[in-house]
């Protein structure tokens, strides 16, 4: 299969929405019956985002095969059906690390290692290998045109377009067209300069996607086309909208997919966007609303919980409920008390690392349990629910995780030293293992117990969900906790590790060691989140039983 490439770059400022624009185009092409994949090339020197601060970089999205990747891959999976893998995201750090490893082994036979050709060749090889078997590959280059660190990536995609032929390659450039209220008009000069910068490194954009707070007037589009050397129909307006799921319709209405198909000589039927129309309808026509308290430690940057936020919204669509997320700093729960949790329809404690704010999360789990508020715990959110139950119900005073207190009398959560991965291989870790890439990662099989809420929600006795953690329930203390009434509703493939717990004496109290948010999509939702939001709605209406 011959693969065609669309290279996506950004100019003027960062955070323009390259990932959303690229994913929206991919969704339209997929709706035309094409097999589409996406890639994200990140110019930073970290080998992967796994050890980066969530408040700097946002969440780490985990793929089925266990890659710790950029959050844009989450957008990709929410917009298209293709599952991302470790081949769909790589960084400058990964490229340099591998090239240097080859140099140390002598693979280059004593050659002087340079950015061109060695680094650029490695980038090109990764793009080609990661896109095989697809009609179209949309390749997003992170950062902004003009950044020093992105130059090797820009040179690599320029070379690749020449090598595969311009009939198989397109460049789509996102740029900002600001509106100046004082002048009463949009300004095209930043776009012109951004394209000039792109031209200086040998790339002529084929499509310009212009970000603005309004549609770009026809005369300004004509001006952009003239001075940026693109056809007028290739100047696409991408105005601000109240939902990112409206973007596919917005760009399709301007013929972006037709431009792509014409360029690549693809004869494909018109896109059927009925599923996206249904999503937009559900979002615009809720029958009620709920307020979910998200108790975390990275709340200053909501993108740190991007997939959780989106999964809650998806569940709202399935229940025809508008979901309001109230971010609660877990340290505020410690200092101000559980009063900050009052008035919430449900409580969610997401994943996290480190002991800052941990007691606040434990208090949130206690508040939800005692006040019969629907509770969903994810990863660390399951562990704090278990710790709280052990302390206050099972009589294990001072129970804790060894992550936060190595000397606790009741280490109900401890470091996993061994587990079986999705392929049946035994993975081992110790406390001396590196931080990067050493967690239990990727999709794992989970057995659900009969008669549990988890089994009822999923409608199956086995599921596959994605993991990202180092600590697990201590099986030595598990019988004591179960005897006190807590139900283990999910177990790992070898039935040794606790994957889900729930409280049978509570209307809706479920927690999972895995990350269900990574597999939620706007079109399909996710059973765990859908059940959670349904319970929140019942609680809001006073109908929770």
UniProtKB/Swiss-Prot annotation:
Gene3D superfamilies: 3.40.50.880, P-loop containing nucleotide triphosphate hydrolases (3.40.50.300). It comes from Vibrio vulnificus (strain YJ016). Mg(2+) binds at residues 72, 140. The gene is pyrG. Residues 1-266 are annotated as: Amidoligase domain. Catalyzes the ATP-dependent amination of UTP to CTP with either L-glutamine or ammonia as the source of nitrogen. Regulates intracellular CTP levels through interactions with the four ribonucleotide triphosphates. This is CTP synthase. It comes from the Bacteria. ATP binds at residues 15-20, 72, 239-241. GO terms for cellular component: cytosol.
């Amino acid at each position: 299969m011959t693969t065609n490439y669309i290279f996506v770059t950004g100019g003027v400022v960062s955070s323009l929405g390259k990932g959303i624009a690229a994913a929206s185009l991919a969704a339209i092409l997929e709706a035309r019956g094409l097999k589409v994949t996406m890639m994200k090339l990140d110019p930073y020197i970290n080998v992967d985002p796994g050890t980066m601060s969530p408040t700097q970089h946002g969440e780490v999205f985990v793929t089925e095969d266990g890659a710790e990747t950029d959050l844009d891959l989450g957008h990709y999976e929410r917009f298209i059906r293709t599952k991302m893998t470790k081949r769909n995201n790589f960084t400058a750090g990964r490229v340099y690390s591998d090239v240097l490893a080859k140099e140390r082994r002598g693979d280059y036979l004593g050659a002087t290692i340079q950015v061109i050709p060695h680094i650029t060749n490695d980038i090109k090889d990764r793009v080609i290998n990661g896109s095989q078997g697809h009609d179209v590959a949309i390749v997003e280059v992170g950062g902004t045109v003009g950044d020093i660190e992105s130059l090797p990536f820009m040179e690599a995609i320029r070379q690749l377009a020449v090598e595969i032929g311009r009939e198989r390659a397109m460049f789509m450039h996102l740029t900002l067209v600001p509106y100046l209220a004082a002048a009463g008009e949009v300004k095209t000069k930043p776009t012109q300069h951004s394209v000039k910068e792109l031209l200086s490194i040998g790339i002529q954009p084929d499509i310009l996607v212009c970000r603005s707070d309004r549609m770009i007037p026809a005369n300004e589009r004509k001006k952009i086309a003239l001075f940026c050397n693109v056809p007028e129909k290739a100047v696409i307006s991408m105005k601000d909208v109240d939902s990112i799921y409206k973007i596919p319709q917005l760009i399709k209405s301007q013929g972006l997919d037709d431009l792509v198909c014409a360029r690549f000589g693809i004869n494909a039927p018109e896109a059927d966007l009925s599923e996206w129309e249904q999503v937009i309808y559900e979002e615009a026509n809720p029958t009620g609303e709920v307020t979910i308290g998200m108790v975390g430690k990275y709340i200053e940057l909501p993108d740190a919980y991007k997939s959780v936020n989106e999964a809650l919204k998806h569940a709202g669509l399935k229940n025809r409920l508008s979901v309001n997320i109230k971010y609660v700093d877990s340290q505020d729960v410690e200092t101000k008390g559980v009063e900050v949790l009052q008035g919430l329809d449900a409580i969610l404690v997401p994943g996290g690392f480190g002991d800052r704010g941990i007691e606040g999360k434990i208090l949130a789990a206690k508040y939800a349990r005692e006040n019969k508020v629907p509770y969903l715990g994810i990863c660390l959110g399951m562990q704090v629910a278990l710790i709280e139950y052990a302390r206050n119900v099972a009589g294990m005073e001072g129970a804790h995780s060894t992550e936060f207190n190595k000397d606790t009398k009741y280490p109900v959560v401890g470091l996993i030293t061994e587990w079986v991965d999705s392929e049946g291989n035994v993975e081992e870790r110790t406390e001396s293992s590196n931080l990067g890439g050493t967690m239990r990662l990727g999709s794992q099989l989970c057995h659900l117990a009969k008669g549990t809420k988890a089994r009822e929600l999923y409608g199956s006795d086995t599921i596959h969900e994605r993991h990202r953690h180092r600590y697990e329930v201590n099986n030595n203390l598990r019988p004591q906790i179960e005897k006190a009434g807590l139900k283990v509703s999910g177990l790992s493939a070898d039935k040794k590790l606790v994957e889900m717990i729930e409280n049978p004496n509570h209307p809706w109290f479920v927690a999972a060691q895995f990350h269900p948010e990574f597999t939620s999509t706007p079109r399909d939702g996710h059973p765990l989140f859908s059940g959670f939001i349904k319970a929140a709605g019942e609680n809001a209406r006073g109908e929770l039983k």
